[in-house]
UniProtKB/Swiss-Prot annotation:
Name of the protein in its database record: Methyl-coenzyme M reductase II operon protein D
Pfam families: MCR_D (PF02505)
Subunit structure: MCR is composed of three subunits: alpha, beta, and gamma. The function of protein D is not known.
GO BP: any one term: methanogenesis
Entry keyword set: Methanogenesis
Gene name of the record: mrtD
InterPro entries: Me_CoM_Rdtase_D
Source species, domain of life: Archaea
Biological source species: Methanocaldococcus jannaschii (strain ATCC 43067 / DSM 2661 / JAL-1 / JCM 10045 / NBRC 100440)
Amino acid sequence: MKNEVKFMSEVIKVVDVKIFPHRYLKAETTEKVLNEIYDLDGIVRVIVHGQPLPKTVPFGPARGLPVNHQDRKVIKVKGEEMELRVKVGEIIITVEGEKLEKIMDGIEEICKRNFPFGYDIYVGAFTKIKPTVTDYMKYGDISSIDPRLIGMVDASARLKDSVKMIK
């Protein structure tokens, strides 16, 4: 199940690894896990997914009032600060195919250490690797964009509000 992505004029075979903790993660745990994942060699990109943590109440009688959720915090990943806008329920890691076995050992160790409540790990293709129509609409000529952005676009959102690139 290896896919190919052109990355800086060379072809890299990539595989996605999905970590599915049995509980939502707190901001502190998310920060710790992401930093440990980024310490592994061969990581192409990491996507966190989960329930949104809005700044304001989106509907109902309290519409527009601020939501002071304890997990909507600024976390530091690899020295870069980012606002955590979701209650993390899954982490998708795109890895270089040649390093999959070594990375899987590291991911398994990270999960055992940080998720005492249990977790599942899946290997497969969970992200887009070929440009979508929305990518063309958002970026136009996609030959000049970072390949890690392929399939990450929300047509109605500003890029800086929806994607945070960690290098």
